[in-house]
Curated annotation (Swiss-Prot):
Its cofactor is [4Fe-4S] cluster. This is 4-hydroxy-3-methylbut-2-enyl diphosphate reductase. Binds 1 [4Fe-4S] cluster per subunit. It comes from Aliivibrio fischeri (strain MJ11). (2E)-4-hydroxy-3-methylbut-2-enyl diphosphate binds at H41, H74, H124, T167, S225, S226, N227, S269.
Amino acid sequence: MKIVLANPRGFCAGVDRAISIVERALELYEAPIYVRHEVVHNRFVVEGLKQRGAIFVEELHEVPDDNIVIFSAHGVSQAVRKEAKERALTVFDATCPLVTKVHMEVARASKKNIEVVLIGHAGHPEVEGTMGQYASDSAGMYLVETPDDVIKLNVKDPSNLHYVSQTTLSVDETADVIDELRRVFPDIQGPRKDDICYATQNRQDAVRDMASQVDVMIVVGSKNSSNSNRLRELSEKLGTTSYLIDCPEDLKEEWLTDQAKVGVTAGASAPEELVNQIIEQVKAFGGTAVEELTGREENMFFEVPKELQIKTVS
């Protein structure tokens, strides 16, 4: 049984930056360091940071006074920022810069009293943070997930409308929603550049290229990872039986029985160390040669905050 590796796969620049922020804060300021929400949606990463002294909370009231708090890569609402400022908490912001770009689009529209439609999944922390950038009382912001949601949308002024999207969605499904928005609201405006992040796009393209070459697809990622779920869904849509797994123990031997080729990819929050562990498990179930496909080269890099760039405390 041949193992075929997607390329690119795994960590993106935003995830790298977010994890580095927590690691450097622990190095410079020592434990405990509080993190609002899982810094990235990967159980392996979160457990590793917990062992080093990071404490993950869902709300700021769980952070004691006079402590450091890190905002996760998914971003937070303006209300959360205001609360942190009022409590004089020391904040390091691990929000992905590509999410921040969407936040700025929403904030600009809000100041101009332009209504905004966000394409995204209800309940996802990125969506909650993005919705929380809108402050206009005279206009409104709306969340849609499917073309059917667009049909039901009742906006105040169809001629004064802008759309943005969650950064980790399915490229194809988002395009379908945008097409419906433009059909129903011909005057709607959108971002100059697609909000779907480069890493989400590249990993979906890699799965698209690989799905027809393998008999079964293993996607490495946590159940709460939006971009990992989209990879599994895309592979299934392309006709390849696919599974999302969090760790080597999740892999079932019967999935690989009588399969000639197994594809392996990973969501943007899954580390290569975990991918390697899962490859070893595939080998234990009969995997032999490993082939890594060629793919789009990624050289994106995001700096950590300057306060965390020093190596030692002076």
